């Protein structure tokens, strides 16, 4: 208490001597930590902005000699000397006349206490209006944003996630002023962690004595990277922000892989002593060199089995961390975070906790989209299983594929979502992706008239503010929150609070559209689908054909029915259950109307950030046109499904005007976006398949998609005409001869016996099984006789040479058996379409 008493003495002397009303003295101990000093600096700058004349002094005796004025305000910044029973990062503010005291439970608590004062000054137009006592602390332990050090397309000669840290690849990474803005934004929103995502960062940041050739950057760039990481961690530390580096497994440095004749990543590669040693030493070197940087471990997307995940984590990653700590002489255990993606995280944690105690777990909230604040099902169970382990469990708001690219920021949706994270999943930490354009950081998809690029931090301020506010405390009164957000929007756009309410309403109404549509009609929540480009009739009529991601419908929304299920129940006169598809498309149309009405009503009254408001207004109109487009198309799909059940041609005829009307809305959408957006989806690789392939950055705009939808309508009309002609006996159907594929000319290096593929052929050397039937396209191709036992034990490898490109067909079983390899899934294997293998060629 000595420090507190001394500071109070200084303040009393200060008040007795008097000072100007506009002068504020900020007092802090001479031994103040970097975080307290930062807090004082932030408070000083804010006070100056409100017209005060602030000065920062320490608690030396000389301080009393420089304060002598008439009247003033004294704010003392302290850290609690006894933290027993106090929550980390919490604070208490006491106010007695002109004497204000901020006592943080730790240095970060002082920062947040000062932020509380700043927030109240902003809300009260610069006047101090503080309660006698105010105490607060965060609910969530970690609250952080992530930045992807990744790009929208692959680098030449490299695979997914393989992006060395270089000025050529990421010029923004070396912009220190931009990082300061980001870190200060995190503080403003009371976030305490920064996640950097990259496939294999080690080869850009550390040198290994045993593998000096593994470094992927030149010496000059390596020094720049060292400087940037030192700068970033130093600036983050003074703000109470924990920097965490994410990496995928098993990924190798390209020069390392080339040196040993390996692939940088191979999902079917077994763990070998070489790749384990390299990775273990990389992790150790990183921990030793950057002791204040945590690790987020993704045991995928290039690992073979769950058993491999356990072995890799317990025998490579954790030993690497311990090696680095040992080199530093540290006996503590810094946090290591484990993603529950493409792995059995419970199995991993059960094996790892006896070896390393300070483990956190992380799992995606709604997969790679935002669909509901009512999560349930098998994915919710993954969360509850992990949160029950006793360690901190992090909810990962990931990618947001269904929200790209338009503005989204519904405070009500976010608050209910964070409540669900706590109450349904048992999570106590937040990991937050950008709202859109993750792969294009720091830019948005907006096309500006001057050719410049808009920054995400400016456009999506509401995204970070909502999540930060509710990660701190989600148990806030709804009425109070409505007033709070009305004021926030009013402040940003220069309107009254009443008009700010209209902007909030536009955000909250539009904020229901994409979540509702994806959870009721989507094929997947993942990057594979870009919802806001639309869907084809075939995808609405039979989503199963496009491989619905398992668990998606059971987990990412309230119980309900797909359109195909709804129509079947209608025909069978069965009762419906839960959320229904036709209700949803009706609701989103209403949401769109309300959003547009609200935003248009306030447009003439906006005085600040007017150009940004026009972009927001345009987005609301985009949402409305999309909602109506989708509504009409779903009703058309309903008629097609009715035809499949009743064979009534009138159903198909009824679908035509609905499809035509859907295109009217889509053409309006093209007009709204052609001069305002560069793209819809920021991942512009072969991973994007729904509504159509996005290879090489194609089919990423609404204008491109309009051509496909117009062709779809033309084909639909032609097919109806053909059906009618057949019914009338006016159509002469020609038998089409199915031509067998031509065998490729290859030179086989692997010694295998060949056999002509036909009914009765034997294709296993150790099993008495024969081909019973096959597609005519495959008749006469060359098959190779394999050992079933060897395939199971060692996998399958066929080495051959070809003088020209050839196609290799791989067959997969439809059922869920485990005897054979499963068809590739882009949701868990980003390399699943590197050879165009993600889509069926013959079914």
Regions found by a protein language model. Give the residues of each.
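Glycan-recognition and processing domains
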Residues: 736-792
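Polybasic, proline/glycine-rich intrinsically disordered low-complexity segments
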Residues: 677-702, 750-754, 758-760, 818-843
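Feature activates predominantly on carbohydrate-active enzymes
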Residues: 22-25, 31, 39-42, 46, ...
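Catalytic-core regions of glycoside hydrolase
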Residues: 63, 124, 172, 192, ...
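Extracellular and analogous surface-interaction loops
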Residues: 787-790, 796-807
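C-terminal non-catalytic alpha-helical accessory regions
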Residues: 159-160, 434, 453-701, 712, ...
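Acidic, contiguous N-terminal accessory segments
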Residues: 9, 19-97, 130, 764-770
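Sec-dependent N-terminal signal peptides
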Residues: 4-15
């Amino acid at each position: 208490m000595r420090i507190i008493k001394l500071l109070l003495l200084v303040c009393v002397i200060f008040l007795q001597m008097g000072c100007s009303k506009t002068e504020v003295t900020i007092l802090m101990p001479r031994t103040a930590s970097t975080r307290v000093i930062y807090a004082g600096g932030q408070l000083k700058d804010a006070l100056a902005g409100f017209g005060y004349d602030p000065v920062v002094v320490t608690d030396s005796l000389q301080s009393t000699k420089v304060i002598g004025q008439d009247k003033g305000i004294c704010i003392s910044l302290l850290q609690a000397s006894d933290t027993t029973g106090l929550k980390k990062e919490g604070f208490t503010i006491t106010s007695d006349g002109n004497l204000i005291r901020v006592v943080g439970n730790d240095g970060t608590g002082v920062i947040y206490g000062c932020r509380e004062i700043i927030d109240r000054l902003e809300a009260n137009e610069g006047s101090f209006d503080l309660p006698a006592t105010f105490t607060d602390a965060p609910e969530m332990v970690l609250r952080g944003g992530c930045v992807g050090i990744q790009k929208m397309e692959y680098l030449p000669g490299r695979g997914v996630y393989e992006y060395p840290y270089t000025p050529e690849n990421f010029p923004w990474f070396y912009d220190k002023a931009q990082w300061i803005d980001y870190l200060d934004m995190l503080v403003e929103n009371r976030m305490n962690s920064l996640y950097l995502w990259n496939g294999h960062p080690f080869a850009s940041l550390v040198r290994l004595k045993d593998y000096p050739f593994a470094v992927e950057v030149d010496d000059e760039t390596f020094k720049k990277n060292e400087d940037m990481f030192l700068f970033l961690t130093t600036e983050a530390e003074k703000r109470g922000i924990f920097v965490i580096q994410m990496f995928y497994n098993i990924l190798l440095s390209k020069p390392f892989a080339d040196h040993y004749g390996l692939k940088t990543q191979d999902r079917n590669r077994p763990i070998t002593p070489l790749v384990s040693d390299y990775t273990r030493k990389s992790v150790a070197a990183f921990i030793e060199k950057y002791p204040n940087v945590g690790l987020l471990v993704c045991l995928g997307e290039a690992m073979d089995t769950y058993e491999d995940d356990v072995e890799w984590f317990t025998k490579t990653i954790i030993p690497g961390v311990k090696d680095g700590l040992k080199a530093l002489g540290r006996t503590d255990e810094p946090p290591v975070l484990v993603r529950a993606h493409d792995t059995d995280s419970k199995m991993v944690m059960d094996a790892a906790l006896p070896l390393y105690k300070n483990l956190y777990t992380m799992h995606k909230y709604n997969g790679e989209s935002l669909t509901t604040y009512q999560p349930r099902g098998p994915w919710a169970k993954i969360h509850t299983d992990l949160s029950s382990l006793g360690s901190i469990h992090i909810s990962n708001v990931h990618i947001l594929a269904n929200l790209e690219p338009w503005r989204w920021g519904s405070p009500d949706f976010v608050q209910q979502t964070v409540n669900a994270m706590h109450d349904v999943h048992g999570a106590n930490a937040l990991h937050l992706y950008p709202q859109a354009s993750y792969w294009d950081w720091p830019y948005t998809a907006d096309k500006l008239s001057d050719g410049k690029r808009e920054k995400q931090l400016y456009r999506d301020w509401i995204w970070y503010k909502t999540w930060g506010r509710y990660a701190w405390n989600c148990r806030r009164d709804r009425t109070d929150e409505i007033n709070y957000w009305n004021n926030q929007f009013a402040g940003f756009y220069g309107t009254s609070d009443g008009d700010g309410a209209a902007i909030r309403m536009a955000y909250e109404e539009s904020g229901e559209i994409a979540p509702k549509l994806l959870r009721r009609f989507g094929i997947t929540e993942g990057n594979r689908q870009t919802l806001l480009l639309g869907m084809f009739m075939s995808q609405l009529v039979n989503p199963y054909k496009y491989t619905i991601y398992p668990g998606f419908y059971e987990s990412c929304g309230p119980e309900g029915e797909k359109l195909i299920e709804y129509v079947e129940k209608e025909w069978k006169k069965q009762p419906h259950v839960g959320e229904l598809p036709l209700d949803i498309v009706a609701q989103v149309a209403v949401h769109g109307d309300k959003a547009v009405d609200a935003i248009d009503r306030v447009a003439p009254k906006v005085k600040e950030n007017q150009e940004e408001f026009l972009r927001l207004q345009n987005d609301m109109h985009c949402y409305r046109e999309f909602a109506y487009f989708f509504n009409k198309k779903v009703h058309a799909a309903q008629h097609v499904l009715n035809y499949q059940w009743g064979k009534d041609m009138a159903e198909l005829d009824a679908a035509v005007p609905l499809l035509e009307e859907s295109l009217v809305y889509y053409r309006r959408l093209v007009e709204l976006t052609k001069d305002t957006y560069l793209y819809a989806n920021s991942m512009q690789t072969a991973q994007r398949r729904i509504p159509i392939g996005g290879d090489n950055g194609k089919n990423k705009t609404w204008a491109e998609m309009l051509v496909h939808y117009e062709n779809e309508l033309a084909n639909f009309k032609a097919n109806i005409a053909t059906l009618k002609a057949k019914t009338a006996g006016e159509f002469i159907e020609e038998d089409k001869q199915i031509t067998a594929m031509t065998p490729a000319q290859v030179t086989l290096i692997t010694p295998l016996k060949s056999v002509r593929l036909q009914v009765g052929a034997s294709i296993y050397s150790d099993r008495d099984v024969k081909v019973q039937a096959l597609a005519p396209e495959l008749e006469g191709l060359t098959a190779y006789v394999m050992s079933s036992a060897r395939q199971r034990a060692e996998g399958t490898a066929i080495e051959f040479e070809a003088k020209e490109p050839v196609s290799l067909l791989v067959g997969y079983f439809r059922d869920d058996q485990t005897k054979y390899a499963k068809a590739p899934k882009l949701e868990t294997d980003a390399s699943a379409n590197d050879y165009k293998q993600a889509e069926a060629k013959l079914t």
